[in-house]
């Protein structure tokens, strides 16, 4: 289930940003983290990651965890994900991964090997922004991280539909916590 591993390099980060930029999605600036979290909380609920945790993870991962899109200068959509270390992948399988307060050891930092992708959240206030972040996520999962196992724990009915119907995730065998996953893409593994 590990697929092919990827190094969290400058080239990888540039590819990720370039893939998302094609959909008008860009890394959140440090001053935008609170607004991005507030937007997500309004749409998903307050039981999500805190602003401080989002900011910490964004910093630890070299600004490749929280992305935003705007319309007419207003923040309208967010896409958040984590790139996991080998220890993070094991924590997911063991049920010990805490998405609201991920251990630094569970995150793949710049220069380290990425073992898995964890979809942290998607939220948008308009159909245009929703399309941007979902299409951007789809492009990243088929491209930059296609060779990795991908995980998520949807918390809303809309999130469950998105992950299963539009993104092709299935229940993770043996998980009783609502965790879904997508196997590494064969074409990406072969490439």
PLM-predicted stretches and their roles:
Residues 66-68, 80, 180-182:
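Short, well-ordered beta-strand micro-motif
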Residues 2-55, 59-75:
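Short amphipathic alpha-helix that is part of the acyltransferase structural core
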Residues 168-174:
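Short glycine-aromatic motifs
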Residues 86-92:
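Cytochrome P450 core scaffold surrounding the K-helix E-X-X-R motif
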Residues 74-83:
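Conserved beta-strand in the GNAT
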Residues 174-191:
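C-terminal "cap" of GNAT-fold acetyltransferases
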